[in-house]
Protein backbone atom coordinates (compact mmCIF):
# COMPACT_ATOMS: atom_id res chain seq x y z
CA UNK A 1 0.00 0.00 0.00
CA UNK A 2 1.11 3.57 -0.68
CA UNK A 3 2.64 5.55 2.16
CA UNK A 4 0.19 8.19 3.43
CA UNK A 5 1.56 11.32 5.09
CA UNK A 6 -0.54 13.89 6.92
CA UNK A 7 1.29 17.20 6.90
CA UNK A 8 0.83 20.70 8.33
CA UNK A 9 3.11 23.56 7.27
CA UNK A 10 2.87 27.13 8.44
CA UNK A 11 3.75 30.16 6.27
CA UNK A 12 6.26 30.50 3.40
CA UNK A 13 9.31 28.97 5.08
CA UNK A 14 7.35 25.86 6.05
CA UNK A 15 6.03 25.62 2.50
CA UNK A 16 9.62 25.61 1.16
CA UNK A 17 10.68 22.91 3.61
CA UNK A 18 7.53 20.92 2.93
CA UNK A 19 8.04 20.90 -0.84
CA UNK A 20 11.61 19.64 -0.43
CA UNK A 21 10.41 17.04 2.09
CA UNK A 22 7.76 15.75 -0.32
CA UNK A 23 10.32 15.51 -3.14
CA UNK A 24 12.76 13.60 -0.91
CA UNK A 25 10.12 11.13 0.26
CA UNK A 26 8.79 10.61 -3.26
CA UNK A 27 12.33 9.85 -4.46
CA UNK A 28 12.18 6.78 -2.19
CA UNK A 29 8.42 6.16 -2.26
CA UNK A 30 7.09 7.34 -5.66
CA UNK A 31 3.50 6.52 -4.77
CA UNK A 32 3.47 8.36 -1.44
CA UNK A 33 0.39 10.49 -0.77
CA UNK A 34 0.46 13.82 1.10
CA UNK A 35 -2.46 15.82 2.46
CA UNK A 36 -3.12 18.51 5.04
CA UNK A 37 -2.15 22.19 5.35
CA UNK A 38 0.06 23.24 2.44
CA UNK A 39 1.40 26.24 0.56
CA UNK A 40 1.76 26.69 -3.22
CA UNK A 41 5.16 24.96 -3.44
CA UNK A 42 3.87 21.91 -1.59
CA UNK A 43 0.76 21.82 -3.77
CA UNK A 44 2.97 21.95 -6.87
CA UNK A 45 4.98 19.06 -5.40
CA UNK A 46 1.79 17.00 -5.19
CA UNK A 47 0.28 17.67 -1.75
CA UNK A 48 -3.51 17.74 -1.41
CA UNK A 49 -4.28 20.99 0.43
CA UNK A 50 -7.14 20.88 2.91
CA UNK A 51 -6.18 24.35 4.12
CA UNK A 52 -3.67 27.00 3.04
CA UNK A 53 -0.40 27.37 4.96
CA UNK A 54 -1.23 31.08 5.23
CA UNK A 55 -3.90 30.19 7.81
CA UNK A 56 -1.08 29.64 10.33
CA UNK A 57 0.96 32.72 9.39
CA UNK A 58 0.41 34.74 12.55
CA UNK A 59 3.00 36.21 14.91
CA UNK A 60 3.16 38.40 17.99
CA UNK A 61 0.96 38.16 21.08
CA UNK A 62 -1.77 40.50 19.80
CA UNK A 63 -2.17 38.79 16.44
CA UNK A 64 -2.10 35.30 17.96
CA UNK A 65 -4.74 36.21 20.55
CA UNK A 66 -6.96 37.73 17.87
CA UNK A 67 -6.83 34.53 15.83
CA UNK A 68 -6.81 32.05 18.74
CA UNK A 69 -10.47 30.88 18.45
CA UNK A 70 -9.99 30.29 14.71
CA UNK A 71 -6.74 28.37 15.30
CA UNK A 72 -8.37 26.19 17.96
CA UNK A 73 -11.24 25.37 15.59
CA UNK A 74 -8.75 24.60 12.83
CA UNK A 75 -6.78 22.25 15.06
CA UNK A 76 -9.91 20.35 16.11
CA UNK A 77 -11.01 20.11 12.48
CA UNK A 78 -7.61 18.81 11.37
CA UNK A 79 -7.48 16.28 14.19
CA UNK A 80 -10.82 14.86 13.08
CA UNK A 81 -9.79 14.72 9.41
CA UNK A 82 -6.45 13.09 10.12
CA UNK A 83 -8.09 10.48 12.33
CA UNK A 84 -10.54 9.76 9.53
CA UNK A 85 -7.85 9.66 6.80
CA UNK A 86 -5.52 7.54 8.99
CA UNK A 87 -2.13 8.49 7.51
CA UNK A 88 0.89 6.37 8.37
CA UNK A 89 2.59 9.41 9.87
CA UNK A 90 1.76 13.00 10.78
CA UNK A 91 4.49 15.57 10.05
CA UNK A 92 4.25 19.04 11.57
CA UNK A 93 6.58 21.51 9.84
CA UNK A 94 7.69 24.34 12.13
CA UNK A 95 4.72 26.23 13.74
CA UNK A 96 5.50 24.36 17.00
CA UNK A 97 2.79 25.92 19.17
CA UNK A 98 0.18 24.63 16.72
CA UNK A 99 1.77 21.42 15.49
CA UNK A 100 3.00 20.02 18.80
CA UNK A 101 -0.48 20.42 20.25
CA UNK A 102 -1.96 18.64 17.25
CA UNK A 103 0.74 15.97 17.39
CA UNK A 104 -0.01 15.32 21.06
CA UNK A 105 -3.63 14.61 20.17
CA UNK A 106 -2.72 12.33 17.27
CA UNK A 107 0.15 10.43 18.89
CA UNK A 108 -0.86 6.85 19.49
CA UNK A 109 -3.28 6.85 16.58
CA UNK A 110 -0.35 7.35 14.17
CA UNK A 111 3.34 8.13 14.25
CA UNK A 112 4.07 11.81 14.75
CA UNK A 113 7.07 13.86 13.61
CA UNK A 114 8.08 17.48 14.24
CA UNK A 115 10.16 18.88 11.37
CA UNK A 116 12.11 21.93 12.63
CA UNK A 117 12.89 21.95 16.31
CA UNK A 118 11.67 24.82 18.47
CA UNK A 119 14.64 26.76 19.89
CA UNK A 120 14.22 24.84 23.12
CA UNK A 121 18.00 24.64 23.52
CA UNK A 122 18.11 28.46 23.82
CA UNK A 123 15.23 29.18 26.20
CA UNK A 124 12.54 27.35 28.21
CA UNK A 125 14.41 24.05 28.04
CA UNK A 126 11.70 22.42 30.13
CA UNK A 127 9.60 22.31 26.95
CA UNK A 128 11.65 19.32 25.81
CA UNK A 129 9.42 17.07 27.91
CA UNK A 130 6.27 18.23 26.13
CA UNK A 131 8.03 17.84 22.77
CA UNK A 132 8.83 14.22 23.62
CA UNK A 133 5.21 13.69 24.63
CA UNK A 134 3.96 15.16 21.35
CA UNK A 135 6.07 13.43 18.72
CA UNK A 136 7.90 10.19 18.05
CA UNK A 137 10.75 11.92 16.21
CA UNK A 138 12.20 15.41 15.77
CA UNK A 139 13.86 16.31 12.45
CA UNK A 140 16.56 18.88 13.22
CA UNK A 141 17.95 21.53 10.88
CA UNK A 142 21.09 22.09 12.98
CA UNK A 143 23.55 19.37 14.11
CA UNK A 144 23.81 20.50 17.74
CA UNK A 145 20.02 20.23 18.12
CA UNK A 146 20.20 16.46 17.74
CA UNK A 147 22.83 16.27 20.48
CA UNK A 148 20.54 18.30 22.75
CA UNK A 149 17.68 15.86 22.20
CA UNK A 150 20.00 12.88 22.68
CA UNK A 151 20.85 14.26 26.13
CA UNK A 152 17.13 14.36 26.97
CA UNK A 153 16.30 10.92 25.50
CA UNK A 154 14.03 12.36 22.79
CA UNK A 155 14.47 10.62 19.40
CA UNK A 156 15.90 13.09 16.87
CA UNK A 157 17.70 13.07 13.52
CA UNK A 158 19.79 15.82 11.94
CA UNK A 159 18.55 16.35 8.37
CA UNK A 160 20.00 19.78 7.51
CA UNK A 161 18.27 22.50 5.53
CA UNK A 162 17.40 21.92 1.85
CA UNK A 163 18.42 25.48 0.94
CA UNK A 164 21.98 24.77 2.11
CA UNK A 165 22.55 22.90 -1.16
CA UNK A 166 21.12 25.74 -3.26
CA UNK A 167 22.60 28.89 -1.70
CA UNK A 168 26.39 29.28 -2.04
CA UNK A 169 28.46 30.22 1.01
CA UNK A 170 30.37 32.76 -1.07
CA UNK A 171 28.06 34.99 -3.12
CA UNK A 172 29.28 36.54 -6.37
CA UNK A 173 28.14 40.14 -5.78
CA UNK A 174 28.64 41.25 -9.37
CA UNK A 175 26.65 38.29 -10.70
CA UNK A 176 23.88 38.97 -8.18
CA UNK A 177 23.67 42.61 -9.26
CA UNK A 178 23.48 41.59 -12.91
CA UNK A 179 20.72 39.07 -12.15
CA UNK A 180 18.73 41.79 -10.37
CA UNK A 181 19.51 44.47 -13.01
CA UNK A 182 21.25 46.65 -10.41
CA UNK A 183 24.02 49.12 -11.33
CA UNK A 184 27.47 47.81 -10.44
CA UNK A 185 28.54 50.76 -8.30
CA UNK A 186 25.23 51.84 -6.79
CA UNK A 187 24.40 51.72 -3.09
CA UNK A 188 21.68 49.13 -2.55
CA UNK A 189 19.33 48.96 0.43
CA UNK A 190 17.39 45.70 0.91
CA UNK A 191 13.93 45.96 2.44
CA UNK A 192 12.96 42.61 3.97
CA UNK A 193 9.61 42.94 5.75
CA UNK A 194 9.07 39.20 6.31
CA UNK A 195 6.92 36.43 4.89
CA UNK A 196 3.73 36.74 6.97
CA UNK A 197 0.96 38.94 5.55
CA UNK A 198 0.25 40.49 8.94
CA UNK A 199 3.93 41.26 9.44
CA UNK A 200 4.25 42.89 6.01
CA UNK A 201 1.10 44.98 6.56
CA UNK A 202 2.22 46.13 10.01
CA UNK A 203 5.76 47.07 8.95
CA UNK A 204 4.53 48.81 5.80
CA UNK A 205 1.95 51.03 7.49
CA UNK A 206 4.23 54.07 7.61
Located regions from the model:
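Active-site and donor-binding regions of nucleotide-sugar-utilizing enzymes
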Residues: 3-177, 192-204
Amino acid sequence: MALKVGIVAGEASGDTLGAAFIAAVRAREPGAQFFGVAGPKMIAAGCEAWESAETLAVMGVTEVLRHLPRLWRLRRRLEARFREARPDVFVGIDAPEFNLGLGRRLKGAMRTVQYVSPQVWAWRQGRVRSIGASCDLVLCLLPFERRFYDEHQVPAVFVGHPLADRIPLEVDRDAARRALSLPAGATVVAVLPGSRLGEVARLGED
